[in-house]
């Protein structure tokens, strides 16, 4: 059982109790009628304390008032517990009076009241002595009363209010409940002394309880702690050692939307109304009330366009006291009414009445807010509107009445209004959010992967998103200011998070996320858990040779959460097995060396299954539905975990049993590569050559291409006057005199002087030009030969390089074929995994394989029915995967056993088993690493020809003076053979006849074989020849049959054998081809000639040195701070001067320098 962070105590006898546990950190309630079966059950009923406060007294000095509610604290909580000190409080006005719980609609309280009289016991009335009252009140009326003797509750200890069924517990016993479930809105205890009262506010959490005979014996809170997450996700508190994937679904508080367009234009409806002139309109008969209205329009909310185009044939009459228009409340004309004016209400009508006073009087009579008058030179048939003019006739005109109020419900416009909505994609990164990406909704952890995806032109053809195998968005793209931005949608919680259980305890978490306090463990990160909380990072300590607990790769995770490295005990020594020779009359006498390649798989790829994530993905509805499936995921996971654990243990044992001591010790000396030339990979030995560093600094060097003879020339001209021997040191190359083409200044002066002197006296001194001409011809020869060799070498390099490239390409092809065969073996492991992932795209009879689409298209009940099919199908796929991995483990386990035998028998020694290490008699085996396995290269010798000899089982010896005895070959010595009438002994596997010696035989006491004598009744299946004719019976069955042995070369082995022999031969040919491509170039050399600087450069260096010394001396004299420099430079006369100058300052013990004041000398 898991060790939990909270102290889980056994709940006491009462099934209706509610006691605080875990250092008063939580409480567990359950009804008396709830008696589940034995085992773990996940349901509500647990409440965790989130806030604690205390109160000393609230009754004042006169005592508390019994039978009334005088004190209350406001809450909004699922449960509130009010507890007194351990000894409790007495039922008296000097200590405790009333405690209550307010569930908004009604109040439940417990009190006592033994007084009578006016104002006493206002809520309950007189209560009998030594009794308490438990009541419930609604709208000031008591609807529940329970009177209990104080013998049951001698003192007040606690009152707990719970929202579930509005339950109230007194001293841990259920005293009130109803069929309503409401949170606690207020509660309080009215008391004077005996406190303090502790208020504990709690929130409701699910709990996993372990019941025995209907009583909860153990409780694990589903509160987000590691223990709660693990137990409540797998519905059990008992876990064996292993790894358990989990998903921590946190509350998502943020949401964002990714829009297809950056902006959306919406054109709102524009209501058009066109006014027109009314023909045959009736004039008014007197007063404004008789003016008849036409074409009345009342605008609703929205946009309107009022067309008064017919007014172009009318003449507007401005306001002139009583005459014309009157619209002081309207600052617009009808011609401009569509210029974006806002109204809260608007009504427009046409009328025909007198221009004289018709508009003004209509506004005063509240028939309109504004009135516009227009003349069309009409007849004078309209009557007046004022009291003295009602019978008079005036000119009729068009009157436009506008009734309006200001506001923003109505707007007039000339054109339809276009509303532009700018969509800003504010994508929330690096935390769990709800998203709506191009219409697909879900939850995810969004990361920016633009830097990784920008170079691969993903979605470059206008695509918006890449979906994963389940149909959810995997990668989506958003057009940014500077180009496309790519984002990756990850699950909110790490899919690879796994709890680690070791020794029955939850000790850590394995995650693929590098969190604070984690430490690397293979390809994951490990977080240690102590007492239910995460602990800071600790390094891996100690080594162990074996691990009885849970292992991850080469690491052992112990029950205390610490990690140790598994270092298998190395094999100290090994010996070769003895020969086990069998008999054969055909003995081989000649052999061939054979190379056989064999691939054996020694490890399998482990898988980590997050069952809940695979089945439901990020769908919360699916996860709720999946809880009905019980421990099916636990069963699948247990199979996969056990396979992984066994795989790790056997793999460690495999390496520990085959790795000899000193295996990792490098050999760095006496390395022989045989005929393989790897000198290009080695650093050539350094040797001192060339001039010194000073010479390289003081001289200018010139390098040129030279011939092999240039080294001898350089040695010949070495020395201060070497340039004088230039022509004497000339060398011959292929019969031609050659000199390096570089001429120094000394040589140039020498040859020029010789040439000029030879021309001074004509033919007499002409012989002086011979040295000049000779050295010139030699240098031209050098240039010509060098250019010719360079051209030839270029042709050789090109031809050889082309040949080498061809061989390298062929080598790469051969290597790829060999690797392809290994890959075919390895890829068999992933076929079932590929099929499992492909199942995510199958709908298994549902309308879609995408869970989000199903819940969006159907209601809850229909969607659950469809998703139930997908859950069943995906669970079946996971079961197939688990079974396949289990079968693969058994096969790989057998392969490892075979590989262990191969290493011990073939690699570490010579096998005596024929054709076990390759084909034939074993000589040598070289192992090589391969993906998920080992390739063995077996060198064996196989028989080419045989000698047919007569084999003798043994000899029976009959001595003259003793009883007879028999001799047979000793085990492993061979067999007796007869050759030309003589007897020899020879090995069974190689024909080497030799004389028989005493060490080759074993003496038997008798020449006869021992048999057991029995009668006929013992062996009932034996028949005589008279009763049964074998020849006749066998002829019935064996006629027309062929007696041929099967062709074992075509036998279908279950062990995958990798044959790369032909590829190895091809690679060997390529190596030979590369060796043939070595280039034998004509040897050239680099000639380096040093040119001395001119005399004026040396003169400038000398002047600069002198100036530097003078400036340095001047600084010493002027500053008086020459110090030790005088002595260092050996300037003895200056030392006294420096001493006198520096003595002007005196340094005291406090390291403060003062200037000494010397007395002035009189002149």
From Swiss-Prot:
Q: Which SUPFAM superfamilies match?
A: Coronavirus S2 glycoprotein
Does this UniProt record's set of keywords contain Transmembrane? yes
Name of the protein in its database record? Spike glycoprotein
Q: What is the lineage of its organism?
A: Viruses, Riboviria, Orthornavirae, Pisuviricota, Pisoniviricetes
- Location of region: Heptad repeat 2 (HR2): 1025-1106
What sections of the sequence does the record tag as coiled-coil? 823-867, 1056-1084
- Keywords assigned: Cleavage on pair of basic residues, Coiled coil, Fusion of virus membrane with host endosomal membrane, Fusion of virus membrane with host membrane, Glycoprotein, Host membrane, Host-virus interaction, Membrane, Signal, Transmembrane, Transmembrane helix, Viral attachment to host cell, Viral envelope protein, Viral penetration into host cytoplasm, Virion, Virulence, Virus endocytosis by host, Virus entry into host cell
- Can you list the GO cellular component terms from the UniProt entry? host cell endoplasmic reticulum-Golgi intermediate compartment membrane; membrane; viral envelope; virion membrane
One Pfam annotation, family name? CoV_S1_C
Residue ranges spanning the membrane: these are 1097-1117
Which domain of life does the UniProt lineage start with? Viruses
> Which sequence ranges are listed under topological domain Cytoplasmic?
1118-1163
Report residue spans for region: Heptad repeat 1 (HR1).
770-875
- Residues forming the motif Di-lysine motif are 1160-1163
Query: GO:BP terms for this protein?
Result: endocytosis involved in viral entry into host cell; fusion of virus membrane with host endosome membrane; fusion of virus membrane with host plasma membrane; receptor-mediated virion attachment to host cell
Give residue spans on the Extracellular membrane side.
Answer: 19-1096
Q: Where is this site: Cleavage?
A: 538-539, 691-692
How are the domains described in the entry? The di-lysine motif confers endoplasmic reticulum localization for type I membrane proteins.
Q: Give the signal peptide as a residue range, or say none if absent.
A: 1-18
Task: Tell me how this protein assembles.
Answer: Homotrimer; each monomer consists of a S1 and a S2 subunit. The resulting peplomers protrude from the virus surface as spikes.
Q: Which family does it belong to?
A: Belongs to the gammacoronaviruses spike protein family.
Q: Which residues are glycosylated?
A: 23, 51, 74, 102, 139, 145, 164, 179, 213, 238, 248, 265, 272, 277, 307, 426, 448, 514, 531, 543, 580, 592, 670, 677, 948, 961, 980, 1015, 1039, 1052, 1075
